């Protein structure tokens, strides 16, 4: 799965983490490994221009999704047997998201994760214009984020345990040495 990211926002963000949550969401939605996605982080004025041009709404917003193809609702890219797909672009505005994160009481990175998953779901054909659509999309978004956080925490615990085990083994001279004959 190819995920390109470009930070043109002037705000320093951990780009690999944004790519990671996008990949996790696409995997959870069973999107083909041949799919391609682009994520662009932009400044407030750029987002304002995009928001007005494409949504006819004034001012900036947090996330916009631009699908490359119109998908038949019965043939979304997350449906079984879907082949390669150029999903489209997700545009994030970290400066706008920073204020939302503060109001929500969480970090900018948590907000960018949420917005990335939100954008992925829009590219896959989900929407929240109607109450039932909103329940489905936001429920799925929250589940993907909870699963992502749980998987990340489990990986961090496993890495910490490996480091602790290595330190103990090294202290007693039993740690494996890299070199010929070792794995």
Curated annotation (Swiss-Prot):
Pfam families: YbeY (PF02130)
Cofactor(s) for this UniProt protein: Zn(2+)
Main localization (coarse): cytoplasm
A GO molecular function held by the record: zinc ion binding
PROSITE patterns membership: UPF0054
EC number(s) given by UniProt: 3.1.-.-
Cofactor binding summary note: Binds 1 zinc ion.
GO cellular component: cytoplasm
UniProt subcellular location: Cytoplasm
UniProt binding sites for Zn(2+): 118, 122, 128
Keyword Repressor: no
Highest taxon in the source lineage: Bacteria
GO biological process: rRNA processing
Keyword terms of this UniProt record: Cytoplasm, Endonuclease, Hydrolase, Metal-binding, Nuclease, Ribosome biogenesis, rRNA processing, Zinc
Annotated stretches, region: Disordered: 156-183
Protein's UniProt keywords contain Lipoprotein: no
EC class (word): hydrolase
Family to which the UniProt record says this protein belongs: Belongs to the endoribonuclease YbeY family.
Role: Single strand-specific metallo-endoribonuclease involved in late-stage 70S ribosome quality control and in maturation of the 3' terminus of the 16S rRNA.
PANTHER family attached to this UniProt entry: ENDORIBONUCLEASE YBEY, CHLOROPLASTIC
Matches recorded under HAMAP family: Endoribonucl_YbeY
Name under which the protein is recorded: Endoribonuclease YbeY
Organism: Saccharopolyspora erythraea (strain ATCC 11635 / DSM 40517 / JCM 4748 / NBRC 13426 / NCIMB 8594 / NRRL 2338)
Organism lineage string: Bacteria, Bacillati, Actinomycetota, Actinomycetes, Pseudonocardiales
Name of encoding gene: ybeY
